[in-house]
């Protein structure tokens, strides 16, 4: 009989990391019969799945590790591990800075966690494996287990874009595409377990080129068409996309696949062609707007969110105004926006940057104020409309109130029977609040 171990996993960063954290627990459970715990003080294994997109996210890792250091005094068998992109970037340096850490593993070596733990216990030496093995982690995925009506499905890993500011190609490695039939099989299993909404994940998900058993290659549009045919799957999302690979095939899918959510997250990063060139984004603002126009010709009411970087080296007030103009023209919905964070080893780190931080903070506030205004207007326009809600559970504030999300990712709270959890429900929107909507069951 396997010894049961309590596992605490803290996840920082993107949805891919959330997916990876779920895989960590499943891999460990196959070998050690693990149970999750929300209290790190009660755990036998503590893992932090890290993000290195921004400097603050990196420092947060060592802050968390500092909180856990003292636990070793009362539990000498405790295993502490660091995974994710900071692990890939820092490697052995994590052990040097925090010698009490037992494991350092990258996104591609999650499947080796059980063996790393055994080696640590056998040798009493910290284990580091941040390689990009020839055999991808997709070959070692455990049987998928649904947790609710929504699920993430990873379809590709890594990125070949090498945008000048980004560490992802260095931490996640080159693009690796998961076989087409394997993705469909996982989606079918999840559907049998009650999953109704699938979010397809990849660092550059719309560049998916999955090998097929017949020797051909499937793009994201073809994959979406096939997933939509699986009984039980009623809503499909994908993230994160790059404008260059937002193809006509994918745009056309919005006309023929009603299961595709009426919302798109498409990071543009900036509104100035000059800045986009320095970012090595390989597209112009005109090309971006042309693709959005084609999409809205098919789905006029689709909402579009994005990612924005403010204060990139060399950004002028004129550049920033072009960004604001783009946000107004496209009418971007709720989006992510950050001040540029210099990442060591990236080309942008060597660019001269003489814009004062006070100016960058002011620009970020102006951008966020505009984005928030857009989002509030979109929310208010939804009042009086009927929305199809996937009911996730109950409200965080009131266990007697149901909660779910619209196609455009709005949280809606409404009264209803708990038997609706995990199902779709039609709800009339009655009120717009700053961070959510209220509604009535139809």
Curated annotation (Swiss-Prot):
Pfam family, one: TRAM
Key words, A-Z: 4Fe-4S, Cytoplasm, Iron, Iron-sulfur, Metal-binding, S-adenosyl-L-methionine, Transferase, tRNA processing
Domain MTTase N-terminal, first and last residues per copy: 5-122
Catalytic activity: N(6)-dimethylallyladenosine(37) in tRNA + (sulfur carrier)-SH + AH2 + 2 S-adenosyl-L-methionine = 2-methylsulfanyl-N(6)-dimethylallyladenosine(37) in tRNA + (sulfur carrier)-H + 5'-deoxyadenosine + L-methionine + A + S-adenosyl-L-homocysteine + 2 H(+)
Main localization (coarse): cytoplasm
Entry's localization field: Cytoplasm
Binding site for [4Fe-4S] cluster 1: 14, 51, 85
Cellular component annotations (GO), alphabetically ordered: cytosol
Keyword Transferase: yes
Positions that bind [4Fe-4S] cluster 2: 159, 163, 166
Domain TRAM: 380-442
Location of the Radical SAM core domain: 145-378
Cofactor(s) needed by this chain: [4Fe-4S] cluster
EC number of this enzyme: 2.8.4.3
HAMAP family associated with the record: tRNA_metthiotr_MiaB
NCBIfam families linked: miaB-methiolase, MiaB/RimO family radical SAM methylthiotransferase
Quaternary structure annotation from Swiss-Prot or TrEMBL: Monomer.
Protein name: tRNA-2-methylthio-N(6)-dimethylallyladenosine synthase
Gene: miaB
């Amino acid at each position: 009989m396997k010894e049961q171990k309590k596992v605490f996993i803290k996840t920082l960063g993107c949805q891919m990391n959330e997916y990876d954290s779920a895989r960590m627990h499943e891999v460990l459970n196959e070998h050690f019969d693990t149970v999750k715990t929300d209290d790190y003080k009660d755990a036998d294994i503590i893992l932090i799945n890290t993000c290195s997109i921004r400097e603050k996210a990196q420092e947060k890792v060592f802050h968390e590790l500092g909180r856990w250091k003292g636990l070793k005094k009362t539990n000498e068998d405790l295993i502490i591990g660091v995974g994710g992109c900071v692990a890939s970037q820092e490697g052995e340096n994590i052990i040097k800075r925090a010698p009490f850490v037992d494991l350092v593993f990258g996104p591609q070596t999650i499947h080796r966690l059980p063996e790393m733990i055994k080696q640590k216990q056998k040798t009493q030496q910290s284990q580091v494996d941040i390689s990009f093995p020839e055999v991808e982690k997709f070959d070692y995925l455990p049987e998928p287990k649904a947790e609710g009506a929504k699920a993430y499905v990873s379809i590709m890993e890594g990125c070949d874009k090498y945008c000048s500011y980004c560490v992802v190609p260095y931490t996640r490695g080159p693009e690796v595409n998961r076989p087409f039939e394997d993705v469909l099989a996982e989606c079918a299993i999840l559907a049998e377990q009650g999953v109704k909404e699938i979010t397809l994940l990849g660092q550059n998900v719309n560049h998916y080129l999955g090998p097929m058993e017949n020797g051909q290659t499937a793009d994201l549009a073809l994959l979406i068409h096939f997933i939509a045919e699986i009984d039980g799957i009623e809503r499909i999302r994908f993230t994160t996309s790059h404008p260059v690979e937002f193809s006509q095939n994918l745009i056309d899918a919005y006309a023929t696949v009603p299961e595709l959510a009426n919302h798109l997250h498409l990071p543009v990063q900036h509104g100035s062609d000059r800045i986009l060139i320095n970012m090595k984004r390989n597209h112009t603002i005109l090309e971006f707007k042309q693709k959005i126009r084609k999409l809205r010709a098919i789905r006029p009411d689709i909402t579009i969110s994005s990612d924005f970087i403010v204060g990139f080296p060399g950004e002028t007030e004129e550049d920033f105004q072009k960004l604001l103009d783009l946000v107004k023209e496209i009418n971007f919905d709720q989006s992510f926006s950050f001040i540029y964070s210099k990442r060591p080893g990236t080309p942008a780190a060597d660019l001269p940057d003489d814009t004062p931080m006070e100016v960058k903070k002011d620009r970020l506030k102006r951008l966020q104020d505009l984005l928030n205004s857009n989002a509030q207007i979109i929310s208010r326009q939804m009042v009086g409309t009927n929305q199809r809600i996937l009911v996730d559970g109950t409200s965080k504030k009131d266990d007697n109130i149901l909660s779910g999300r619209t196609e455009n990712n709005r949280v809606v709270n409404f009264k209803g029977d708990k038997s609706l959890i995990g199902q779709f429900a039609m709800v009339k929107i009655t009120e717009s609040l700053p961070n959510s909507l209220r509604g009535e069951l139809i």
